[in-house]
Amino acid sequence: MGPPQYSLSFDQFQQYAKKGNLVPLYREILADYETPVSAFAKIDHGPSAYLLESIEGGEKWARYSFLGSGAPAVVYEEQGDLFLVQGARKKRIASRGNPLERLREIMESYRPITVPGLPPFVGGAVGYLSYDMVRTFEDLPARQKDPLNLPDFAFLLTDIMLIFDNVAQKIKVVATAHVTSKGPRAIKSAYRSATERIERTIARLRR
């Protein structure tokens, strides 16, 4: 058995890394008897993960299902302030008007690259906006006490995505490489980290 075949060689990866700082790298495997739900149970997703099933027209199962795992960044709003959680670090971002604008500012630091062979969706900020977010835009009466004490919105950015092709019965295991600088050492480290995450994920799927 030869070495794993990734979607981009290191030389190709270097070229894409010149254009942005988030480069998706993937390896394709056969789904065999795996389903999105069974894969979700196997991977090390912790508290931050999602499974998106594709439906067309409300009843037709679409081609792709998406499973996101591993959250290097979580952004949520609480009492008008934003909090950015990266690993063990939690940073409070003071409120300055619309919290969605603060979220936009955070997202502007990420410059994703589009590579061939992937569907339009390969990750990004995935989460929810609560009903009470309407108070950000409209002058409404004070809301009642929230017994659940949930954030008004929360989004996570995952660095591993499983893309199930329900037609071809294949899985693309995608790792998003975050290139922190344009130096050769940083690019090489980002590529190596992405391949290692891909292989760890595949190993968990094959247990």
Predicted regions mapped to residue ranges:
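Extended accessory regions or peripheral subdomains of proteins
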Residues: 2-49, 54-95, 131-207
